[in-house]
């Protein structure tokens, strides 16, 4: 796939592109299953590539240094996942392992005059999960797994000058790692239309990447690099439940009332030995709604989404919202002192419906943000208000 973004200086006939960014992603996956009785083993490998093309201009046709160099990331992965049924199929056991090799390559970038550099690293990530079926649809489950977040190419191998600061990559930089443990209880009776699950989870994050800056006392040159320093921890619960009212009548349709809730108990990160609440994390997130599906093909869904408060850094308040600080001094004085802002909670509803016209042809309607809620997912970027989409589909 290709994503291309051109940012213009203004919305006029004389405007020009001052920042152009193109990101190309491609790859493949090859996998197979080995079935031995009721035991199943999946294995395979995959490849993912990202190629960035970025160019910045200070005048029409005059190149300037972009905020980061062009790069190419290549990742190869090998995985093995087994799903075993033991003790007369009362115990479902899943054990897996994944190995990833990632290669970074920074490319020469107009305006930065940086040299081409490359770095690489590899990582192993195991996982194990178990589910024990007790009786009558009741089961307990638990799992443990590790994961990683790939570093940016310039954090690992960069060396370029931008806005007077020399950025130097750290070849010893490790990817951010996480370990997650969860356990819970589930009850499922499809013939009764009932499904319920409760899960408690705890996640540890290690080797979070932070910036490290200093100034050379003799030359006055500013430097910036990256290191693994911080930690984080998150814990909470997830509840999912649904009931199909269609089971009370006949099997011609399903009318499912559903809901799921994530409630965070802990969300903290450690910087220089001090634990603070992690920014941009909501304490509550919930989805709920009503789903209708008829055997003749008509379907409809009303979905609601609730998002709790979130706290972010107040990057744009002084420049674009000069009157906001006066309001914050009255309502959020503690956050104003720390240059933070607490965003309000919101609830958004969406509606969709689809109906078959003739064989293999259907039409549908989406109404997003049904009640025209004004909300943001990121400060300064308000999400679209009420909008409509009409679609038609033909299957072969």
Question: Residues of each region from the PLM?
Answer:
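Membrane-embedded beta-barrel scaffold of Gram-negative outer-membrane proteins
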Residues: 1-11, 49, 53-56, 133, ...
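Face-selective signature of the C-terminal outer-membrane beta-barrel domain
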Residues: 1-110, 120, 197-200, 236-243, ...
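Transmembrane beta-strands of outer-membrane beta-barrel pores
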Residues: 2-4, 36, 47-53, 97-105, ...
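Extracellular loop and loop/strand-boundary signature of outer-membrane beta-barrel proteins
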Residues: 11-20, 27, 60-69, 107-117, ...
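Hydrophobic, lipid-facing positions within transmembrane beta-strands of outer-membrane proteins
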Residues: 24-30, 74-80, 124-128, 140, ...
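Structural signature of Gram-negative outer-membrane beta-barrels, strongest in the C-terminal barrel
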Residues: 38-42, 46, 66-203, 291, ...
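Conserved C-terminal beta-signal and adjacent last beta-strands/turns
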Residues: 80-83, 131, 142, 175-180, ...
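Gram-negative outer-membrane beta-barrel transporters
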Residues: 88-93, 200-205, 221-316
């Amino acid at each position: 796939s290709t994503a291309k973004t051109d940012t213009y200086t203004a919305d006029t006939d004389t405007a020009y592109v001052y920042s152009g960014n193109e990101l190309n992603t491609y790859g493949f996956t090859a996998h197979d299953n080995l079935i031995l009785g009721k035991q199943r083993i999946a294995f395979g490998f995959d490849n993912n590539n990202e190629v960035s093309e970025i160019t910045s201009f200070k005048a029409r046709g005059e190149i300037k240094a972009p905020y980061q160099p062009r790069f190419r990331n290549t990742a190869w992965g090998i995985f093995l996942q087994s799903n075993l049924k033991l003790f007369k199929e009362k115990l479902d056991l899943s054990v897996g392992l994944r190995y990833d090799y990632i290669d970074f390559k920074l490319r020469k970038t107009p305006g930065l005059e940086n040299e081409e550099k490359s770095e690489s690293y590899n990582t192993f990530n195991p996982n194990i999960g178990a589910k024990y079926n007790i009786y009558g649809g009741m089961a307990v489950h638990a799992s443990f797994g590790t994961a990683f977040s790939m570093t940016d190419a310039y954090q690992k191998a960069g060396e370029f000058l931008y806005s007077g600061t020399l950025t130097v990559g750290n070849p010893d930089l490790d990817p951010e790692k996480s370990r997650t443990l969860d356990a819970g209880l589930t009850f499922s009776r499809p013939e009764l239309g009932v499904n319920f699950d409760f899960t408690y989870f705890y996640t540890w994050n290690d080797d979070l990447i932070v910036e490290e800056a200093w100034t050379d006392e003799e030359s006055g040159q500013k430097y910036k690099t990256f290191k693994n320093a911080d930690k984080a921890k998150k814990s909470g619960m997830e509840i999912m439940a649904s009931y199909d009212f269609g089971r009370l009548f006949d099997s011609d349709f399903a009318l499912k009332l559903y809901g799921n809730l994530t409630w965070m108990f802990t969300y903290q990160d450690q910087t220089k030995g001090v634990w603070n609440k992690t920014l941009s994390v909501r304490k509550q997130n919930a989805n709920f709604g009503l789903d209708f599906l008829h055997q003749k093909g008509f379907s409809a869904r009303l979905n609601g989404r609730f998002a709790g408060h979130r706290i972010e850094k107040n990057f744009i308040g002084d420049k674009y919202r000069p009157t906001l600080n006066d309001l914050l001094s009255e309502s959020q004085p503690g956050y104003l002192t720390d240059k933070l802002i607490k965003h309000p909670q919101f609830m958004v509803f969406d509606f969709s419906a689809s109906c078959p016209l003739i064989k293999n042809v259907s039409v549908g309607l989406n109404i997003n943000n049904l009640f025209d809620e004004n909300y943001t997912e990121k400060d300064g970027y308000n999400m679209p208000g009420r909008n409509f989409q009409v679609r038609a589909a033909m299957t072969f």
